[in-house]
Amino acid sequence: AALAIDLNIGLDRNKVRGALEDTRLANDMYTDAHARLMITRGTKVKPFQHPSLSLSGPTMVIIMEHSKALSARPIRLSTVPHMRGLPMTQDPKLNSHSKLNCVLACIAAEKAGADEALMLDINGFVNTTNACNFFIVRNGTVWTSTGDYCMNGITRQKVIDVCRENNISVKEKNFSLVETYGATEAFVTGTFGAQTPVREIDGRIIGDKDLGPVTEKI
């Protein structure tokens, strides 16, 4: 991602790993540590866009904290008009600080009384939430979006791998809101949320219990 946006971090991969390890050890963290790595272009002489105005070169911030198991409380989603960016505008596969569309989606969902926003892609198919990847279960098969218009998260891929390794049918495909409303199970995935069940979408109850059998098996 840094190479794609012409950002020279000034450190190779091993040195970045070393900085993460140094931060972990400095905080006496040995298990279940979560590292958030953020890199900017550094301090600027003026608050303008051009990268050449940076005075100090890249700034790297490492926030190290212990991951805590989140409640298994199922969440509510609300569909919003905001979409993830397109590759020619703001590629959703770039994990950048500039995610105003996701922030606006989050605000819209909150105002609708939901926990997260369900976002569609440019073709009207179900894509992702404002912060997590999204899955449904229909007829025992796990569905998630094609991944063309969302961040293909590590936990998302782990769920797909677990399904394939355990003979659980899984598909990366286009699917509609109507198909989503008819799902028997739904869940979201993310680094902190891991695998969180979804109980309600746009006021429609999904499934007949909080944690469906396929979700529980995964």
Role assignments for model-derived ranges:
Residues 1-118, 122-125, 151, 160-218:
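Conserved alpha/beta cores of soluble small-molecule-handling proteins
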Residues 118, 125-147, 152:
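Glycine- and Gly-Pro-enriched alpha-helical subdomains that act as flexible
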Residues 155-157:
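Secondary-structure junction motif
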